[in-house]
């Protein structure tokens, strides 16, 4: 009986090499200027002749001229070069490790001579190779060869096909994917130090001086001991080989751990992790906390040491990285496109950018306009200053939201952690002091004690959102004190003494001491946070849930609309999507506003007044927060953030007024609760007072009636936190009462009896 057989379709590698050579030498693309993407070329004038350029031959020429050391082979180019030949593309994706070597061999064969004079003193390997060539001129030809890995001055990587390809999650990887080129999405949880990895080991004989090379392709190898040269064999000398470190070739190596995202984990499961190996030029391309798509070759690796004895036939798996794509890029790395720049210019021309951006933050959450404005300033941030003596003044803004349950504090925190390029969300009960700062761990690769960053380190140059801030243990909460002002974390444990950067903004949410706010107890006792911590927050919002027929009705309508239509109610403008908000903030953060002399004097007077108000509140037992010199810095930081939103390099008095208004509004609900007479002041009367004060500020010129334009009133009223509807209702109400008069089609407003209302 004949044994069953199967027909394995083994690719013809010689034929594949011919196709690869043809692709590398003949693939051309339209010429792209520096800083532009390929897709932007289609926007050029239709009448221009496209200038085609050989893409990969140019890359090889740069490598030959020592101007580059990376070849990125985009498999989209291979598909575009010959769409009918899908077999080669399939072979590469299913057996990528073998085709890396084939592409490298073809690149070696096509490597052009340098077109510029090369200085061989740049690298140690160049000097050694030059000496080897001179030495081998008189040696037998069979001993003149060098391993290809030794002579290659480049790293070759594949970029996967992007069309109709959905990234894998870690738990979706199967045995059938081994050896394949694939893309995995996850969050980076740990990165090791970059270490040299041996790829070609060089030995020198102590008897005859013969040089032997050994290519290393696995974790472990057996070093050569006896010289294989003919001279030693003839003389029966058995020369001993010694490793020559400077003549060997090392590649930078970094091990990275990625973990599944929250939305990839099934119900009741815990996130899985995957080890990723980075070699060569792509090391240091990811940081802990980054959400990335990593493309690479999924490979098995046997366990070593004692773990091999326990594992038996089991093997571990890892991903050999070829390409890294950041899902959410940092503000400095966001690529500007003509479309995004045009959208930003259109947004600026429309006016009220501050209002539109604030309303675009969590639009499905009703109200909280002033809270959203403060969160917008948190995203933009102030200007970090470094003085000549090394002193550093932080520019990041810290905000604390405290108040009754059910006012959407946690939802706002969740949204900010997602819209920020680097956002970490954690809770007070689920976080320890070590989990927030740094923990000492044993590195599984080197077996050394290393530091692993916590939530605050992961949020470096980003935002750390801490929910249930009041429920943290006091010993854990003290770990945040240094971060909130000095923006560093000092570690001294397990023989490691160092300082880590934690240049992060803190956004905290807390409930009052008794669950709900108790108006019979002083405000400072309701909050139950130490004064040293409260003073580090630039602005502290107290959000009380007080019954109000009008507000409750609007809130209920808003919530029911969201549940009916799965979207927020229609606004007078289209809310900006998070990506557009990131692009605008990225442009705004390029400005570094300065504070002129007149604004400095104005801020000084405002700060002195705040201190006087605090003294009065302490006497009346209405103290809400401590006014300290840090409050002065907070005003300046928020003013700088507002100037950045205007794309201005100067802070104006209006910016300081808005910062002071936000500080006042943050505790307005408290004063409304303490002062029952304040409930008698309606929204319309507040807006009327603003209009009256504006009219009083106009100088009285004999023969001219004092009037205001609707545009000026609208800008002032909206800046105070009111809406367009509030303004229209106020003007209509006071016009019906015979107090105001509108002219010029409603664009000009004046008082019917100016003298009477100037006195009131």
Swiss-Prot record:
GO molecular function annotations of the record: ATP binding; ATP hydrolysis activity; DNA binding; DNA helicase activity
Domain MCM: 353-559
Binding, ATP 2: 536, 630
Subcellular locations according to the entry: Nucleus
Gene Ontology BP term (one): DNA replication initiation
Keywords associated with the record: ATP-binding, Cell cycle, DNA replication, DNA-binding, Helicase, Hydrolase, Nucleotide-binding, Nucleus
Uppermost EC category: hydrolase
EC number of the protein: 3.6.4.12
Family classification: Belongs to the MCM family.
Species per Swiss-Prot/TrEMBL record: Schizosaccharomyces pombe (strain 972 / ATCC 24843)
Name this polypeptide is given: DNA replication licensing factor mcm7
Lineage: Eukaryota, Fungi, Dikarya, Ascomycota, Taphrinomycotina
Keyword Transmembrane helix in annotation: no
Gene: mcm7
